């Protein structure tokens, strides 16, 4: 079992990402990037917990067609509190570990981590997308590949994200 402390690294990274105007991956109109970097945050113990009295955004489970796998794939889209379709948001694409899936970040409370970071550190809200990195029709769950075959399936993820997932997100959400 993975301990809460192991997720603090993820929380720090997510807090750092929300510290800047994230551009490039999803067609945000702004090209402003902060040149001031803060590398230390006091991460509260409840960083990935649902906090009483805090309003959180919504999580959409989506399906998009992947030409890489020739199948429908699922992803979670984490929308910030007070999501407004007339406003553009930066998008953060979350990559899981080798044996994970799109649901990993949902399981560890990514929506809470993101909103808590916005509230704790006065950062701009972002849209986050978690997806299955492994580009096999079954998501790698029933595979019997050797390591080189597995890494090739992961490497194909770049094509899938650029040609299927990002266009889907840009078409259906305010980026």
Predicted features along the sequence, with ranges:
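Gram-positive cell-envelope targeting signals
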Residues: 1-38
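Non-catalytic cap/lid and distal C-terminal segments of serine-dependent acyl enzymes
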Residues: 29-175
């Amino acid at each position: 079992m993975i301990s809460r402390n192991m997720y603090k690294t993820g929380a720090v990274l997510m807090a750092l990402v929300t510290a800047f105007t994230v551009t490039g991956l999803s067609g945000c109109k702004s090209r402003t990037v902060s040149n001031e970097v803060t590398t230390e945050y006091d991460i509260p113990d409840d960083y990935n917990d649902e906090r009483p009295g805090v309003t959180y955004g919504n999580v959409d489970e989506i399906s998009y067609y992947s030409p890489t796998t020739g199948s429908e794939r699922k992803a979670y889209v984490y929308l910030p509190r007070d999501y407004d379709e007339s406003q553009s948001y930066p998008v953060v694409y979350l990559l899981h570990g080798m044996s994970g899936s799109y649901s990993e970040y949902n399981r560890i409370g990514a929506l809470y981590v993101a909103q808590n970071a916005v509230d704790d550190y006065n950062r701009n809200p972002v849209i986050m997308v978690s997806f299955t990195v492994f580009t096999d029709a079954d998501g790698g769950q029933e595979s019997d590949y050797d390591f080189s075959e597995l890494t090739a399936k992961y490497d194909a993820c770049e094509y899938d994200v650029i040609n299927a997932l990002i266009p889907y997100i840009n078409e259906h959400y305010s980026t």
